Curated annotation (Swiss-Prot):
One of its GO terms (molecular function) is acyl-phosphate glycerol-3-phosphate acyltransferase activity. HAMAP family: PlsY. It catalyses: an acyl phosphate + sn-glycerol 3-phosphate = a 1-acyl-sn-glycero-3-phosphate + phosphate. Signal peptide: none annotated. It comes from the Bacteria. Belongs to the PlsY family. It comes from Dehalococcoides mccartyi (strain CBDB1). GO terms for biological process: phospholipid biosynthetic process. Probably interacts with PlsX. This is Glycerol-3-phosphate acyltransferase 3. One of its GO terms (cellular component) is plasma membrane. Keywords: Cell membrane, Lipid biosynthesis, Lipid metabolism, Membrane, Phospholipid biosynthesis, Phospholipid metabolism, Transferase, Transmembrane, Transmembrane helix. It is a multi-pass membrane protein.
Length: 216
């Protein structure tokens, strides 16, 4: 029964993550396909460059909600009794981590857009908000400061997700936070960093687009 529930959590969370809010908002608001502009991604950064701040903020918020909703759904499926310590508690944490990662995977490889979406940053933070708000807030602040000081959204995104992981290390080792939270941060930050590999190459070559540059 537990395996069936975990499978349900993964499938539903992946579908939630696959909802392409960047594509939907751009198509409805400006009758354009966001994938034909800029990076070709459906995330908030490309929406910002193409449609402006209001649309980008809406998309980022909706993408965050996807991640948080997936983690919340895992809690509902496993059951409230799993909040107790022991085997059920471990099952809940495992399910929540799976849900968050499945949502991130859905955002990156959405089934509705031939498996080409965004880079998963906002959805990752949505899952982190539901799992460990303090790490999400810290990582979000690092992201904003990093992007603001450097002018590069990609650099801010990478430092933000790594920052969330960096905070979870002492929280786990010293304060006794669940190891599963750190596992989520490790896998999520690694995946997002890999998805930014082209940006990293451009950063090193001095050719990365600035945050305020319009998409072409």
């Amino acid at each position: 029964m537990l395996i069936a529930k975990l499978l349900l959590v993964v499938i539903v969370s992946y579908i939630l993550g696959s909802i392409p809010f960047g594509y939907l908002v751009s198509h409805r608001g400006s009758k354009i396909d966001i994938r034909s502009f800029g990076s070709g991604r459906t995330g908030a950064t490309n929406v910002l460059r193409t449609m402006g701040r209001k649309a980008a903020l809406l998309v980022a918020s909706l993408d965050v909600i996807k991640g948080a909703s997936a983690v919340a759904f895992a809690g509902l499926v496993i059951g409230t009794e799993a909040l107790a310590f022991g085997t059920n508690g471990m099952a809940l944490l495992f399910a929540q981590v799976l849900a968050g990662l499945a949502a991130v995977a859905g955002h990156i490889w959405p089934v509705f857009l031939k498996f080409r979406g965004g880079r998963g940053v906002a959805t990752f933070f949505g899952g982190m908000i539901a799992l460990c708000p303090v790490a999400a807030i810290f990582g979000g602040e690092v992201l904003i400061i990093g992007a603001g000081l450097s002018g590069f959204a990609s650099l801010g995104s990478i430092t933000g997700v790594v920052g969330a992981y960096a905070l979870l290390v002492p929280l786990t080792l010293i304060s006794g936070f669940p190891t599963e939270y750190m596992i989520y941060a490790v896998i999520g930050s690694l995946l997002i960093t890999i998805m930014h590999r082209d940006n990293i190459k451009r950063l090193l070559a001095g050719k990365e687009r600035k945050l305020n540059e319009k998409a072409r």
